[in-house]
Curated annotation (Swiss-Prot):
Taxonomy, superkingdom: Bacteria
Gene: sprT
Subcellular location field: Cytoplasm
Name the UniProt record assigns to this protein: Protein SprT
Active site: 79
GO cellular component: cytoplasm
One of the Pfam families matching this protein, by short name: SprT-like
Organism classification: Bacteria, Pseudomonadati, Pseudomonadota, Gammaproteobacteria, Enterobacterales
Family: Belongs to the SprT family.
Single GO MF annotation: zinc ion binding
Span of domain SprT-like: 22-163
Record-linked InterPro entries: SprT-like_domain (IPR006640), Uncharacterised_SprT (IPR023483)
């Protein structure tokens, strides 16, 4: 799937939110953390990722275009919080107490670990699997692990192994 071009107004709104959150954090933490690099190269079902060593935030342009306001309000501060925790505390658990504190007390945003965006447009092919109680869909990666005998996946409801078909 080709990555969509993001309108400049959306890119500006993302950058504005990033700068507002960063300024707020620098003020509350009495620091002068630099602005991270912002790129729109995240693919798949992840809304964004924070790359600590390169001090970079990668955002998913497809999910951004489909969920502009919520994405800017939640995903941008979420990823920035990861970088700020790394700068302020060093390497910590990705969604640990330091990250939660950074989100809620410093940035003033609810600390949610996952997004609730519709994923139909970014989800790849899936393979049907079933157990005793329901039908399931496995991603290509998980399906290939089953085929190679590297993994067995179980139903979260009944605990039975998932079987292809």
């Amino acid at each position: 799937m080709k990555t969509p071009r993001l309108p400049i107004a959306i890119q500006q709104a993302v950058m504005r939110r990033l700068r507002e959150n960063l300024a707020q954090a620098n003020l509350k933490l009495d620091r002068h953390y630099p602005e991270p690099k912002l790129v729109y190269t995240q693919r798949g079902t992840s809304a964004g990722t924070a790359w600590l060593e390169s001090y970079e935030i990668r955002l998913n342009p497809v999910l951004l275009l489909e969920n502009i306001d919520t994405f800017i309000a939640e995903v941008v501060p979420h990823e920035l919080a990861h970088l700020l925790v790394w700068k302020h505390f060093g390497r910590k658990a990705p969604h640990g107490k330091e990250w939660k504190w950074m989100m809620e007390s410093v940035l003033g945003v609810p600390a949610r670990r996952t997004h609730q965006f519709a994923l139909q447009s970014v989800r790849r092919n899936t393979f049907p699997y079933h157990c005793q109680c329901q039908q399931n869909q496995l991603t290509v990666r998980r399906h290939n692990r089953v085929v190679r005998g590297e993994a067995v996946y179980r139903c979260v409801h009944c605990g039975e192994p998932l079987v292809a078909g």
